[in-house]
Swiss-Prot record:
Main function: Binds to actin monomers and regulates the organization of the actin cytoskeleton. At high concentrations, profilin prevents the polymerization of actin, whereas it enhances it at low concentrations. At low concentrations, associates with the poly-proline motif of formins to enhance actin filament elongation rate. Binds ACT1, ACT7 and ACT11 and inhibits actin polymerization. Coordinates the stochastic dynamic properties of actin filaments by modulating formin-mediated actin nucleation and assembly during axial cell expansion. Binds G-actin and poly-L-proline in vitro.
Protein name (record): Profilin-1
Cited CDD domains: PROF
Disruption phenotype: Delayed germination. In young seedlings, excessive numbers of root hairs, abnormal raised cotyledons, elongated hypocotyls, and elongated cells in the hypocotyl. Defects in rosette leaf and inflorescence development.
Induction: Down-regulated by light.
Pfam families according to UniProt: Profilin
Gene3D superfamilies listed in its UniProt record: Dynein light chain 2a, cytoplasmic
Quaternary structure annotation from Swiss-Prot or TrEMBL: Occurs in many kinds of cells as a complex with monomeric actin in a 1:1 ratio.
InterPro entries hit by this protein: PFN, PFN_euk, PFN_sf, Profilin_CS
Protein's gene: PRF1
GO molecular function: actin binding
GO biological process assignments: actin polymerization or depolymerization; defense response; inflorescence development; lateral root development; leaf development; unidimensional cell growth
Amino acid sequence: MSWQSYVDDHLMCDVEGNHLTAAAILGQDGSVWAQSAKFPQLKPQEIDGIKKDFEEPGFLAPTGLFLGGEKYMVIQGEQGAVIRGKKGPGGVTIKKTNQALVFGFYDEPMTGGQCNLVVERLGDYLIESEL
């Protein structure tokens, strides 16, 4: 299965009639393995901030999480495994695997819980597959 099919079939899937607004799988170096059409262009310093927060949980909390130049308020995640951000009626979930970062962006009517489920389910599968 190609990385693009993971994005198309497993991240951009239908969840109770809703879909993520954007999704991607990136290498931990920030290289894009696959992405949806509306996934924002991330800056190197934004990837560095994400990596730093996974190493030092809470690093992004004072300044916020920036993705594609947009600021997200960091909300409770899972130390070293998941970063969650909120911006208005939407947000983002980022799941770290052994080799990758799985991103999912959502907006109403999709909920943060639905986004978490989709992103973390694929992330857990990749971890089990040692990816």
